[in-house]
């Protein structure tokens, strides 16, 4: 197995992201957040934007799942949606590049099969992760050549709004042979452990660790 994949097997990956409208939006802060995650035992980091990734690499040497969130007016796909974002991440040297692999139309109107074929031909040694929202998408991602699937978008597409992340994870791990990374709505250590027991290769946790406004709100709401 690939050494990068082996290094994250059965372990926690922390998603260090803060968008423009969030209190901790700052590449410097994300770098320190990644260091805090490393200090706590994280085996990898998921990060958004070249700027954040550069800063994170100054602070830790952990494997990075890189994405670029870019909104295009003609599509709902925004996680590394075009070849431009892929190449920006390639140039930054991230170990894994995650891409929206849902069945929604891409902004460049490219078919997902042709899109992954093009970038894998150009960058044969790069690991690509399919961010999916359903079992069918996971199966298709494996078929067309993705190296990893992640349950990142379960519940976030119009056709999976009522899906539960761990329930979908159970279905995905039964039908695909490539590593499945559990991600999305894993907001407690117990859920992370459960994901591994279900068969996840690794687990990504974001907001429950790195978004203090969300953590604070959970306390406030519970105390009402």
Swiss-Prot record:
Annotated GO MF terms: N-acylglucosamine-6-phosphate 2-epimerase activity
Matching entries from Pfam families are given as: NanE
Q: Name one GO cellular component term.
A: cytosol
Query: Could you tell me which Gene3D superfamilies the record lists for this protein?
Result: Aldolase class I
E.C. code: 5.1.3.9
Taxonomy, superkingdom: Bacteria
Among the GO biological process terms of this entry, one is: carbohydrate metabolic process
Q: Kindly state which reaction or reactions the protein catalyses.
A: an N-acyl-D-glucosamine 6-phosphate = an N-acyl-D-mannosamine 6-phosphate
Hey, which family's this protein in?
Belongs to the NanE family.
- Purpose of the protein: Converts N-acetylmannosamine-6-phosphate (ManNAc-6-P) to N-acetylglucosamine-6-phosphate (GlcNAc-6-P).
- The name of this protein is Putative N-acetylmannosamine-6-phosphate 2-epimerase
Q: Which organism does this sequence originate in?
A: Fusobacterium nucleatum subsp. nucleatum (strain ATCC 25586 / DSM 15643 / BCRC 10681 / CIP 101130 / JCM 8532 / KCTC 2640 / LMG 13131 / VPI 4355)
Identify the gene encoding this protein.
nanE
């Amino acid at each position: 197995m690939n050494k990068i994949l082996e290094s994250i097997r059965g372990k926690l990956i922390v998603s260090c992201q803060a968008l423009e409208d969030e209190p901790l939006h700052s590449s410097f802060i994300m770098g320190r957040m990644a260091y805090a995650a490393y200090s706590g035992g994280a085996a990898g980091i998921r990060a958004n934007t070249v700027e954040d990734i550069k800063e994170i690499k100054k602070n830790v040497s952990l494997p990075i799942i890189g994405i670029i969130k870019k909104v295009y007016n003609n599509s709902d796909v925004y996680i590394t949606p075009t070849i431009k974002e892929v190449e920006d991440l390639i140039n930054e040297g991230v170990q894994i590049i995650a891409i929206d692999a849902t069945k929604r139309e891409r902004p460049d109107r490219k078919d997902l099969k042709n899109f992954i074929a093009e970038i894998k031909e150009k960058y044969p040694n790069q690991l690509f992760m399919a961010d999916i929202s359903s079992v069918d998408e996971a199966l298709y991602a494996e078929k067309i050549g993705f190296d990893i699937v992640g349950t990142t978008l379960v519940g976030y597409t119009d056709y999976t709004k009522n899906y539960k992340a761990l329930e979908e994870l159970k279905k995905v791990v039964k039908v695909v042979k490539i590593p499945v990374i559990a991600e999305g709505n894993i907001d407690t250590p117990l859920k992370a452990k459960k994901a591994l027991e279900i068969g996840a290769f690794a687990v990504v946790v974001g907001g429950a660790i790195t978004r203090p406004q969300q953590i604070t709100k959970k306390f406030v709401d519970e105390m009402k």
